[in-house]
Amino acid sequence: MKKAILIFLLAVCQLSAFAQRAALGKLSPWVRSIVAEQRLSAYVQNSNGKSFAKSTADANSISSSPMLTAFVRAEGNVDSLFSANGCQQLLSCGDIYIVAMPISNIASLSQNSQVSRIESQRGTHALMDISGAYLGATKAYQGLSLPQAYTGKGVMVGVMDIGFDLTHPNFYDRSATNYRIRSFWDQLSADTINSAHYVGQSYHGTEALLRYAHSRDGLDQTHGTHTLGSLAGSGFNSPYRGIAYESDICIVANATVDDVAFIDTADYYKFTYATDALGFKYIFDTADSLGMPCVVSFSEGAPQDFRGDDQLYFAMLDSLTGPGHILVSSAGNNGLIPSYIHKPLGDESRGSFVWTSANRASLTINSLGVSALRTVFYHDTDVNDTIIIKTSEVLAAEDSMLIDSTIIAGQKLYLSISAYDNCYDASRQVFDVQFLTLDRLDALGKMSVEIIGKDADAELYCDEGYLVANDLNPALQDAECTHNINSPSAAPSVICVGANSYRQSFENYLGDLRTYDMGTNGQRGEYSSVGPTFDGRIKPDVMAPGTNVISSYSSYYLENHPQASDILSDVAHFDFQGRTYAWNANSGTSMASPIAAGVIALWLQACPTLTPQDVMRIISHTSRRVDPTLSYPNNLYGYGEINAYAGLLYILGIDGITDISHSTPHDVAISPLSGGRLKLAFASQPSQSLTATVYSLSGNIIDSQSFMPTGDSHVLQLPASASGVVVVQISGEKQYQGSQLIRISK
């Protein structure tokens, strides 16, 4: 621990020396910290009397330097520039490149006048809801009412995630005879001989995929098996069918912080946001090679920042998305965590207590005008320790950085505050604040923080630690559960999905009833992250069911972790080709993202050239507004719950026909039979006559029949002119009223 703090302080102090070797303003903060760490490592290793310069020169050896995957914005002919600096160009979109570069040569690259920015950031987290662990249960997803005529056929759906079981029968068709995964890139695969990729290996075709069996992390992770099932699973011998169940599938297993054990330390910096962007490109390229439109679901994320760590990432995503290329991502699961405080101009102070079980806490202050941070440590005595740091003092310091230490409760507290311009609004300054100790921070006493100063409009974000209330100062209860949307969901070109709730309990495979109440009837799951984004845009964009979704779980995870706590949320175990598989209930915006992506796959089947802007227009016109007391869009629900059927009617241009319902009927299922017939199956025999009216997609009436069912089903014979996709409108008793898109079977 002492060594960690020493290195932290040295890293900060060494930035001035580093500035002589690199153009700091061109580097995102994480890239700066990487190079500073390498420089410090060389300094620490220089214990045999060699000069510091010689030690650094040794560290600059390209052959021995770790490689970083990063975004580079550069002008002109970059081939010779990259070659001279030992860089491998992996992807280019306009003036933005994804490059594998030796860390030792970042400084040299940054000094070149062609280069305006080098950006990278460490990997993401899988976004499973953790509140179920605290409340003791999860529950099942009931499913959406989906149009029979649109199933995702002819559309490529993609998932980038961790923990894939490629052998799960959910990824075959319903009969388990036709395998639907077309291609898989495992970025963590150790089988890199003759690989076409910078990291890992790709696998194509049924035989190769089933032989590989699972992603490298598949014995210990199963997140991707679940999310892919929600999007595209056939439901094999169960009611747990995904949304786009006849789509083709392409998947990428990336690396998250959950996968550190599978990454060699020499390769740690290869797995970044830029590597994720390569994964998205791989899926879109696979779809293009097969002539299919594509939607990708991404159920991972990391916090936003004001530093600009993801500016080039967002620009790259803008380039990758477009007609027939849609990217959907989960909002995050921080909706129950107070992490934001706003002190308006004219107010003297706003604040909260901070709690952490770790040895550090981190805050970010975004300020317009001069403010100060007041930190108080409360003790059992009447004397408290108070620290006040003015933002003006930080700005006046060398390199806009203050480092200090003090004694609190007999222990040393280290403080670091660095200032920089807000990357979204240069009129505002941002201050990164870190508190560190040799032991637990709460050993110094109860800790409160306040933004003070009437002349400033200021925001405080808690990055490490938790903002909590405490009776020691009841006035400090200003923390809000907002401003916590994850990246890349915060990107303008990404469809950001929050989670809402339906079922409140389920029975697991042991027969135990498990209850986890996050609301019903589409109410927002309280864990679902809330906007706005750090630059003030409304997010999430839309909601989808995410609380207690039932989907596929990995047989390899079940085999290797039979006593894991999440196995108690399995609703069924079953055998297939000699292995035991599971259906599992889980919660989080991780579950909502693939469901929304599945709906968009149905829309792409109807209109393969949809752009992200088209999708947002459909969402804005057709989403179900769950809470009618709110105005839409808003930072809780976006435009509301995604509506697969209403969206299809809108795309097909028949939503304006007043006699066609915008919802499917509740108590009757309509299915095509051979010979141009339709079967209507009722939940119970109707007591009154019904009318079935059949419309073409041009809005013309093809047929209309009134009938009195004599049982719980009825068969209609349609005229020969009824072909292709038609709209069937049922009128009569309320529970049977609605419309459905049906593909006629001849």
Tell what function each PLM region has:
Residues 649-677, 685, 744-746:
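Residue-level detector of functionally pivotal "anchor" positions at catalytic/ligand-binding pockets or at interdomain
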